[in-house]
């Protein structure tokens, strides 16, 4: 007789600390957030071999890996922050882009995960085009170029600060949070958001989430102007900039959904093994 233990230990999480949601913490985040942004639009002045569509493809692959491995929500945006900062300073051949993406996920998971991704597992996701030793060597290269500044501010750092100030029922906040996290992940796949302050992306994502849910009457109704005014006060964001950011976020979601539906209609959806993301693909899976 063979006994199988199928119990899985849940991830141990600390009790929420209200001190971390005080206004002084929010102000500190707003003060330092721009230190961790790419210093230039690197496709124009640094990268000669890498094109925007290549970044989008590797970003989508990274997102699929993070989703399949059930990584914390912060891991993917943080990994993309590392990737963009590295590419903003180091000319990189396109043949090394997936290796760079794997290294960035490796570093981000070490910072945010209880059990980080292993080098061997990440190499499997590259279809073994990257070797573990190569990944470990590049880890040191990336760390050096980033000057070991890994604790970057991401949009997720602002989500709880924003949600706790909203006039919404507590049970509705989890739904708003989930939608906002989806928008943040989508923004990370699109280079146009790479140089936006994280607070702007977080505020726009929450605004887009609430507006979308209000159409389905899932949350308390607020006029668009009232919601925008409230959000700008929380993160000290310019009203016009926030409106423009939110419109761009909604456009990115609409475009990705239309693209997915078109792929389904044309019958071009891949029929390969869906259990392992080995090749970068277009953005198509957004769980709302």
Curated annotation (Swiss-Prot):
Record's GO cellular component terms: chromatin; cyclin D2-CDK4 complex; cyclin-dependent protein kinase holoenzyme complex; cytoplasm; cytosol; microtubule organizing center; nuclear membrane; nucleolus
Compartments where located: Nucleus; Cytoplasm; Nucleus membrane
InterPro entries: Cyclin (IPR039361), Cyclin-like_dom (IPR013763), Cyclin-like_sf (IPR036915), Cyclin_C-dom (IPR004367), Cyclin_N (IPR006671), Cyclins_cyclin-box (IPR048258)
Residues bearing the modification Phosphoserine: 270
Post-translational modification: Phosphorylation at Thr-279 by MAP kinases is required for ubiquitination and degradation by the DCX(AMBRA1) complex.
Entry's Gene Ontology molecular function annotations: cyclin-dependent protein serine/threonine kinase activator activity; cyclin-dependent protein serine/threonine kinase regulator activity; protein kinase binding; protein serine/threonine kinase activator activity
Region: Disordered, residue numbers: 264-288
Principal location: nucleus
GO biological processes: adult locomotory behavior; cell division; cellular response to dexamethasone stimulus; cellular response to follicle-stimulating hormone stimulus; cellular response to growth hormone stimulus; cellular response to insulin stimulus; cellular response to testosterone stimulus; cellular response to X-ray
Cross-referenced CDD domains: CYCLIN_CCND2_rpt2 (cd20577)
UniProtKB keywords: Cell cycle, Cell division, Cyclin, Cytoplasm, Membrane, Nucleus, Phosphoprotein, Ubl conjugation
Post-translational modification Phosphothreonine, affected residues: 279
Chain ranges of the Cyclin N-terminal domain: 26-151
UniProt family annotation: Belongs to the cyclin family. Cyclin D subfamily.
Function per UniProt: Regulatory component of the cyclin D2-CDK4 (DC) complex that phosphorylates and inhibits members of the retinoblastoma (RB) protein family including RB1 and regulates the cell-cycle during G(1)/S transition. Phosphorylation of RB1 allows dissociation of the transcription factor E2F from the RB/E2F complex and the subsequent transcription of E2F target genes which are responsible for the progression through the G(1) phase. Hypophosphorylates RB1 in early G(1) phase. Cyclin D-CDK4 complexes are major integrators of various mitogenenic and antimitogenic signals.
Quaternary structure and interacting proteins, as annotated: Interacts with either CDK4 or CDK6 protein kinase to form a serine/threonine kinase holoenzyme complex. The cyclin subunit imparts substrate specificity to the complex.
Listed name of the protein: G1/S-specific cyclin-D2
Lineage of the species this protein comes from: Eukaryota, Metazoa, Chordata, Craniata, Vertebrata
